[in-house]
């Protein structure tokens, strides 16, 4: 604990709020995910750091839930991998990895339209995260891999991103992708990111995506549609057109902010569905593809634990900060009475404030 009573008061209050949340999420709503085959999954958690400890495992659901209720961690994780020895310290070989979930992590940065500090969030950067999920699904996962909405699990991370799990209903396909090794997963994500794009032998999916973008930039596409050797065709164009073509290809290849380590790392941890994100206090929440597609999910509304928006605190915020809107209410450094939902966000971002009597 800190020697400063005001700091201790804030930490104790934050800890109490997390405990209240887990009591409700576990005992009342059954929100908290219990990872499949729990005894073969590694569990990690963080309090003041993103990850304070990992290499934990639990034999039963009850043991796991009892631990969560007792500790009420600010960050809670489970491994994507299934392991024979999840509590052993070391890599995949020591842990005895025998299969692994396949998931994408889209984690966006602030956009050109954002007016806030890099670490803050707003409708613009959250909207960009949504758009990137739809690009991943509609440009690749649906048409290229024959997946449907029922084959995906989409999770809002509680910050500026989403996790997209591949969960095919076909048991044989699910078994196959969960047996993928690092090389197969690496090939998968590099294809989607266009890292190995061969302009002398363009595949149909990337050809269709790029032709669509060329048309937006008023680049003639008829000859590109008829050939797979794009390099030769590009070389016939004028310098300005050629430059525009390469710039367009570059922008398309870089439009997805995918965390490649999540696909590459054999023993990667991801946030547990139904927990809270320790930096924002927002819920790690599973949503449907249709709610995302139809813009029915608003992270700054539906990601807020409603009960925490009704508990109010008198505070003194000691530094200037950007505004943040939660559930339609906007707060900033001038706010003197704030809900617990905003209190968690301030704490997670290391903002200097005190709770008043």
Swiss-Prot record:
Enzyme Commission number, as recorded: 2.7.7.-
Cited function: Catalytic subunit of DNA primase, an RNA polymerase that catalyzes the synthesis of short RNA molecules used as primers for DNA polymerase during DNA replication. The small subunit contains the primase catalytic core and has DNA synthesis activity on its own. Binding to the large subunit stabilizes and modulates the activity, increasing the rate of DNA synthesis while decreasing the length of the DNA fragments, and conferring RNA synthesis capability. The DNA polymerase activity may enable DNA primase to also catalyze primer extension after primer synthesis. May also play a role in DNA repair.
Subunit description: Heterodimer of a small subunit (PriS) and a large subunit (PriL).
The species this protein was found in: Methanococcus maripaludis (strain C6 / ATCC BAA-1332)
Leading EC class: transferase
Pfam families assigned: DNA_primase_S
One GO CC annotation: primosome complex
GO biological process, one term: DNA replication, synthesis of primer
Similarity comment text for this entry: Belongs to the eukaryotic-type primase small subunit family.
CDD domains: AE_Prim_S (cd04860)
Co-factor(s): Mg(2+); Mn(2+)
HAMAP family for the chain: DNA_primase_sml_arc
Listed name of the protein: DNA primase small subunit PriS
GO terms, molecular function: DNA-directed RNA polymerase activity; metal ion binding
Catalytic residues, chain numbering: 105, 107, 259
Keywords carried by this UniProt record: DNA replication, DNA-directed RNA polymerase, Magnesium, Manganese, Metal-binding, Nucleotidyltransferase, Primosome, Transcription, Transferase
NCBIfam families, per the entry: primase_sml
């Amino acid at each position: 604990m800190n020697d400063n009573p005001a700091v201790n008061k804030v930490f104790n209050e934050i800890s109490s709020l997390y405990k209240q949340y887990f009591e409700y999420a576990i005992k009342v709503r059954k929100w908290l995910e219990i990872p499949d085959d729990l005894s073969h999954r590694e569990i990690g958690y963080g309090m003041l750091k993103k990850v304070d400890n990992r290499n934990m495992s639990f034999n039963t659901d009850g043991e796991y839930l009892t631990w969560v209720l007792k500790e009420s961690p600010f960050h809670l994780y489970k491994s994507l991998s299934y392991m024979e020895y999840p509590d052993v310290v070391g890599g995949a070989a020591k842990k005895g990895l025998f299969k692994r979930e396949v998931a994408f992590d889209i984690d966006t940065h602030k956009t050109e339209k954002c007016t806030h500090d890099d670490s803050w969030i707003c409708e613009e950067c959250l909207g960009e995260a949504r758009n990137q999920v739809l690009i991943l699904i509609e440009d690749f996962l649906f048409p290229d891999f024959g997946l449907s909405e029922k084959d995906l699990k989409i999770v809002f991370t509680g910050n500026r991103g989403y996790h997209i799990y591949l969960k095919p209903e076909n048991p044989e396909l699910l078994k196959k992708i969960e047996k993928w090794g690092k090389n197969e997963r690496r090939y998968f994500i590099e294809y989607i990111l266009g890292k190995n794009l061969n302009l002398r032998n363009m595949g149909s999916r990337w050809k269709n995506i790029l032709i669509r973008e060329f048309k937006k930039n008023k680049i003639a596409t008829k000859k590109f549609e008829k050939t797979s050797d794009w390099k030769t065709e590009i070389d016939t164009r004028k310098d300005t057109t050629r430059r525009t073509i390469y710039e367009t290809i570059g922008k398309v290849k870089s439009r997805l902010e995918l965390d490649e380590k999540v696909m590459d790392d054999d023993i990667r941890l991801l946030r547990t569905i139904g927990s809270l994100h320790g930096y924002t206090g927002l819920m790690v929440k599973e949503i449907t593809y249709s709610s995302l597609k139809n813009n029915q999910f608003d992270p700054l509304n539906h990601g807020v634990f409603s009960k925490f928006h009704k508990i109010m605190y008198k505070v003194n915020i000691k530094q200037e900060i950007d505004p943040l809107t939660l559930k339609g209410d906007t707060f900033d450094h001038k706010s003197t009475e704030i809900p617990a939902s905003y209190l968690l966000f301030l704490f997670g971002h290391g903002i200097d404030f005190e709770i008043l009597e």
